[in-house]
């Protein structure tokens, strides 16, 4: 792949009010008449996690690309403290976004938490899912395999409120779970700086998102 670059919404990224009650920030690439690929990001990420260069490659292969901010992420609705939801609710958001756009079905690609969401779409909304790719993710089955203790500890550590300190934490965390074959600290640093400039995720959002994983089980 060519070098990626973090994107900027430039104030022009649309927001859809979904039937699930979420205001969902999304971005489209390519021709909506082409088959759609929905890209679903992971915990602590935003739609910027999918580089424009990657989206451009998919468009070049004849796909319409849809990337969006999950609930409690980026510029989508940040829910009140104490709100509980599940992966099923998050999968329903993705399907409701298709409804909003008048898209009958799509290929779903998810990373980490996004991988769990697309698994749920495939299981609960099979008529809307043409195919599913779940990357760097889990099924919720404790026998399936789990990250190492150091990785789990880093994932569960609360992110600092200070944007610069939060970026440093993310750079260090990514060293734990990114492949050394392609790890690019400069890109990771720029990406997380773009996250914090665009929308700093409140700490309570992490607990709600992680709670969705725990509540959903296997």
Regions found by a protein language model. Give the residues of each.
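Short beta-strand immediately N-terminal to the catalytic nucleophile in serine-hydrolase-like folds
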Residues: 108-110, 135
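Short, positively charged and aromatic/hydrophobic N-terminal segments
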Residues: 2, 8-10
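Flexible "cap/lid" loop of the alpha/beta hydrolase fold
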Residues: 123, 130-161, 205
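Gly/Ala-rich beta-loop-alpha elbow adjacent to hydrolase catalytic centers
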Residues: 110, 114, 118
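Conserved acidic catalytic loop of the alpha/beta-hydrolase fold
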Residues: 88-106
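Alpha/beta-hydrolase
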Residues: 149-218
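Conserved HGGG/HGGXW glycine-rich cap/lid loop of the alpha/beta-hydrolase fold
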Residues: 18-80
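Catalytic nucleophile-loop/oxyanion-hole region of alpha/beta-hydrolase
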Residues: 79-91
């Amino acid at each position: 792949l060519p070098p990626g670059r973090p994107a900027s919404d430039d104030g022009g990224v649309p927001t859809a009010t979904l039937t699930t009650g979420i205001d969902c920030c999304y971005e489209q690439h390519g021709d909506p008449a082409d088959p759609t690929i929905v890209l679903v990001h992971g915990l602590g990420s935003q739609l910027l996690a999918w580089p424009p260069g990657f989206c451009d490659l998919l468009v070049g292969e004849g796909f319409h690309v849809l990337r969006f901010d999950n609930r409690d992420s980026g510029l989508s609705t940040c829910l009140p403290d104490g709100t509980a939801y599940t992966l099923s609710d998050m999968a329903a958001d993705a399907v409701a976004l298709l409804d909003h756009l008048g898209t009958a079905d799509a290929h779903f690609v998810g990373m980490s938490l996004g991988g769990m969401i697309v698994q749920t779409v495939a299981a609960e909304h099979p008529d809307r899912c043409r195919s599913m790719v779940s990357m760097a993710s889990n099924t919720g089955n404790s026998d399936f395999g789990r990250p190492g203790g150091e990785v789990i500890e880093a994932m569960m550590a609360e992110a600092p409120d200070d944007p610069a300190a939060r970026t440093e934490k993310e750079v260090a965390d990514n060293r734990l779970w990114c492949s050394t074959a392609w790890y690019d600290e400069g890109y990771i640093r720029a990406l997380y700086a773009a996250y914090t400039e665009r929308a700093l995720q409140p700490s309570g959002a992490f607990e709600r998102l992680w709670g969705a994983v725990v509540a959903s089980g296997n």
